[in-house]
Structures are given as structure tokens and as C-alpha cells.
């Protein structure tokens, strides 16, 4: 039984939350782009859709868990075969977010933002996260680091007034 479009969009979105891939890259990702190496499973894109640069992204178990079963599909088969347009996917994500009680604007790009912010918040360094995202300039990645710093400031400020000041 083929998964519904809603399920395919959800799987691809969550996969991107753990890989940082753009919609244009995940929608064209084939089984042939996924390689087993001595270091683990990696995605190897010869040319990213947006930047036309080569990108290699290691896959962690969380990312792998969101991938559909390959079965006997050829290497040329797209991994997330049901994705049509980013607009259609964004409409599905908006509906899924609403059903889940999420009151924020969610688009496919949100997964990329989620990956970057979480990788930095977990202690990943700016340079490595920048390379994983395929950014040409570390300044582009700095936007996500600023979000993490804002969150740290909010957390520290929660402690104000907790104890009597001198």
C-alpha cells in the first residue's frame, strides 16, 4: 500500500529536520544518492539544486527512521517519490500543523531552520553546521546562531528574581 501524500510530506519534512536538506534536494533525492560507507550512511549529492555544489551529509538514526522502505526500488527511484511541488507540500504541512495544534506558520523551509537551530543548540559548531547546510558563507548560518543566543538569553532571564538579590 502506497503512503498517502500527507504521510509522504510528513516523512520528508521530518527527514529534513534531521538532515537540513532543502526541498529541492529532498524531492530529487534518489536511492543512488544514499551510500553505505565505513563511517555510516551518507547522502552524496553531486550538485545541490540551488547552489550546484557537491554536498555530503551523514545520516543519523533519526533521519534514517523517517525514510520509507526501499524494498527493491532501483537506484534511480526517488526516495520520497510522492512529492510534487513545494507549494503543495507547504499546504499539506499547514494542514498537519493546524491539526496538531501548532499555531505558527510552517513551511518546508521550517525543517531546514529546525535542523540548523537544533544542531547549534546541541553544541554543533557554526562551521560544521554551515557545511552540512551547504552554505557558501558562514554568515548565512550565523542567523541560526543568533536565534540560539536569543533562546539562551531568555533562559537566563527566567532566573531573575528567583533568589533574593543583595
What do the PLM-derived regions correspond to, one by one?
Residues 1-14, 35, 49-50, 84-85, ...:
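Conserved catalytic core of the tyrosine transesterase superfamily
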Residues 1-23, 27, 73-74:
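Basic, Lys/Arg- and aromatic-enriched nucleic-acid-binding interface segment
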Residues 8-10, 83-87, 103-123:
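Short basic/aromatic active-site micro-motif
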Residues 14, 18-25, 92-95, 99, ...:
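C-terminal catalytic core of tyrosine-transesterase DNA break-rejoin enzymes
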Residues 28, 36, 143-146:
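Phosphate-coordinating loops and pocket residues in cytosolic domains that bind phosphorylated ligands
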Residues 48-52, 133-158:
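Catalytic-site neighborhood detector that most strongly recognizes the C-terminal catalytic loop/helix
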Residues 48-68, 74-95, 107:
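C-terminal catalytic core of Y-nucleophile DNA break-rejoin enzymes
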Residues 73, 160-166:
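C-terminal secondary-structure termini that scaffold catalytic or DNA-interacting sites
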Amino acid at each position: 500500500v502506497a503512503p498517502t501524500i500527507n504521510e509522504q510530506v510528513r516523512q520528508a519534512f521530518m527527514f529534513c529536520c534531521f538532515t537540513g536538506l532543502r526541498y529541492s534536494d529532498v524531492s530529487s533525492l534518489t536511492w543512488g544518492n544514499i551510500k553505505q560507507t565505513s563511517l555510516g550512511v551518507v547522502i552524496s549529492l553531486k550538485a545541490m539544486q540551488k547552489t550546484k555544489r557537491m554536498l555530503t551529509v551523514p545520516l543519523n538514526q533519526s533521519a534514517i527512521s523517517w525514510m520509507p522502505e526501499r524494498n527493491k526500488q532501483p537506484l534511480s527511484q526517488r526516495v520520497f517519490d510522492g512529492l510534487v511541488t513545494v507549494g503543495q507540500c507547504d499546504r499539506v504541512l499547514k494542514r498537519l500543523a493546524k491539526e496538531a495544534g501548532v499555531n505558527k506558520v510552517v513551511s518546508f523551509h521550517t525543517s531546514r531552520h529546525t535542523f540548523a537551530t537544533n544542531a547549534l543548540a546541541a553544541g554543533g559548531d557554526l562551521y560544521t553546521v554551515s557545511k552540512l547546510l551547504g552554505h557558501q558563507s558562514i554568515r548565512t548560518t550565523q542567523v541560526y546562531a543568533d536565534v540560539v543566543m536569543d533562546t539562551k538569553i531568555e533562559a537566563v532571564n527566567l532566573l531573575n528574581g528567583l533568589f533574593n538579590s543583595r
